[in-house]
Amino acid sequence: MGLEEIVTDLKGKRVLVTGGAGFIGSHIVDVLLDESCTEIVVIDNMVRGRPENLAYAMARGPVRLVNGDIRDTKLMTTLVKAADVVFHQAALRITHCVAEPGLAMAVMVQSTFDLLELCVKHNVEKVVAASSASVYGMAEEIPTTESQHPYNNRTLYGAAKAFNEGLLRTFNDMYGLDYVAFRYFNVYGPRMDIHGRYTEVLIRWMERIDAGQAPIIFGDGRHTMDFVHVQDVALANILGAKSGICDEVFNVAIGVETTLLQLAQSLTKVMGRESLDPVFAPERSVNPVPRRLASTSKAEKLLGFRARISLEDGLRGLVDWWRAERHRTGAAVHAKAAGS
């Protein structure tokens, strides 16, 4: 299917975004503001999400935040019944899945099944689902295309995402439920979780660099990732929703391989601390995949999607946001203390 067949319009649609107050979900909501949707409903249990992530969107458009859990069948029935399009972003982090595997199965597998059943029952037009490069494990094909098999994955998180992709294909065959799914590679940018227990390595590094300490690299620094800015990820989701394409999965990445050492050096440069050389620690075993590099040709060909934000520009924006956020939250803490 070619670009000339991209015909779907989100104008006037009622949209539901699960996990929509989180890192990626809130950026999807921001982009949806320009699509003239009738209503954008966000459900989030605020484990990873924050109301502040939606402040911009809620001030500009028809955005409604529901503080709830996707495991709440009664609530989800009400929300899905009123939706035309569903963006399914709710999930746990890969490290959280390791810590609480039972919860991971309930949130990431059972709740996805329940959601898809509701989408069929209430005639949802399209599901736009978040998947992950974790489904590949250590890919045998570099750059990795979407046809790479998922059998090298050795994480519960990746297994859950692969199973969810299978559910989407099955529901498309059995019930005609339209969907597109996106395998996110290494997403970064504003609104990364700086407050939670399972924070990203970039956040830890910024904290250390800002304090004049060297960033810690677990391993030898030669592991690679394919970093993609969260605003580009949001754009891919909107293009997928608006396209006439369904029953397809796409890599979302920039298509550039960056070592952890290169990332640390880029970050110290952006933060004005180039003299801080990274220090190395024993490698962790949560997700020991030595290489990540995506083929982005399928998304470019079928969706017209190409990541636009370079790593250096993206890191600069991330640092600016992080410093402003630290200043804002620090000021709020001081104000609260002064009033107590």
Regions found by a protein language model. Give the residues of each.
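Short-chain dehydrogenase/reductase
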Residues: 105, 154-162, 196-200, 227, ...
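A glycine/serine/threonine-rich, flexible loop-to-helix segment
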Residues: 142-143, 194-203
